[in-house]
Every structure is written in structure tokens, then in C-alpha cells.
């Protein structure tokens, strides 16, 4: 964003034209988070510009070509997402996985996930579900299950020891 004065890399075009910086990718892949068992979740609270700059500085790459850094970050994301997928899915038994959210707009990222996971990657748009609405739909389903007093978790996904009813209902004023 900073180097190109853009909000995002549309379809991963800038990253697609970059080259992986092997030592940067190897160093980032050593982050302890990636070896934690699922379930897990993270985001900008850990992985932000300062995190990338710290790795670049440690490798004396503070002046690396921005497109090469982007390419390395796309590969980092594709590898770690693919590794996580493979812990819960046998690629030989799955026809496709479906992406939603902001990453679903990055065609290059989806291609790299498909290559690394050996599973076709499509977007939820192909299922008639807007990629920007999937999270809202999921939370609506959680709420429906709560109202119906039915469990809404899967032990193999959440790591819970048993199925349980999620959330709470409170009386309004």
C-alpha cells in the first residue's frame, strides 16, 4: 500500500509480477504462530507493516523491491493457508474449496492456494453467496441455532470437547 499508494493489490497483479525473496519467505514461515494447532485466528494485530519491516531489516533487505515483498507475502499466505487446509481436508477427497472475504478478490492469491494445496479454489460467489456477506450469513446461522437451542459448533473445527449451544439471549428494554 505504502510503496504503490494503492488501497490494495487488485487481483494480485503487483505480486504476480514480483519474485519471491527466498530468505524473507523462509524467515516469515518460522513465525511460531504457524506451528500452533487449530483452532486459531489472527490478523492485523500481529501481521502488519511493522512485522514485515522487522523481517526485512533483520535480513538487510530494507530496500527490497516492493513487488518482490508482495510476491513473498502472497506465497507466505498461500503456503500457510494450504498447510492449514491440509490438516483438516484430504485434497484427494475434495473437489474444491470456496474462498470469501477480501482475499477472494485476489485472483493470484487464489491461484497460489490452489497450487500449494492441490485443491481447486473457487469463490462463494459461484455458490450464489456474495463473498462480502459470508461472515454475516454465518453469524445469522449461529443466531438461528441459538434460538432453536441447537448446537452450532463442530468439535473437529473448533477444538471443543463436545457440541454445545453457542451465544446467549438477553431481554431487551
Language-model regions, residue ranges each:
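Catalytic phosphate/nucleotide-handling subdomain of diverse soluble enzymes
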Residues: 1, 79-164
Amino acid at each position: 500500500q505504502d510503496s504503490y499508494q494503492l488501497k490494495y493489490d487488485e487481483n494480485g497483479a503487483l505480486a504476480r509480477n514480483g519474485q519471491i525473496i527466498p530468505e524473507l519467505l523462509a524467515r516469515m514461515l518460522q513465525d511460531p504462530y504457524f506451528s500452533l494447532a487449530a483452532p486459531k485466528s489472527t490478523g492485523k494485530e500481529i501481521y502488519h507493516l511493522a512485522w514485515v519491516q522487522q523481517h526485512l531489516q533483520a535480513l538487510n533487505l530494507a530496500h527490497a523491491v516492493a513487488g518482490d515483498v508482495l510476491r513473498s507475502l502472497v506465497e507466505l499466505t498461500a503456503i500457510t493457508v494450504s498447510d492449514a487446509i491440509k490438516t483438516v481436508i484430504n485434497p484427494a477427497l475434495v473437489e474444491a474449496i470456496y474462498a470469501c472475504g477480501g482475499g477472494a478478490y485476489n485472483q493470484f492469491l487464489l491461484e497460489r492456494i490452489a497450487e500449494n494445496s492441490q485443491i481447486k479454489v473457487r469463490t462463494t460467489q459461484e455458490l450464489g453467496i456474495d463473498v462480502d456477506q459470508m461472515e454475516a450469513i454465518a453469524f445469522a446461522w449461529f443466531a438461528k441455532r441459538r434460538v432453536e437451542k441447537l448446537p452450532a459448533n463442530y468439535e473437529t473445527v473448533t477444538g471443543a470437547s463436545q457440541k454445545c449451544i453457542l451465544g446467549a439471549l438477553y431481554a431487551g428494554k
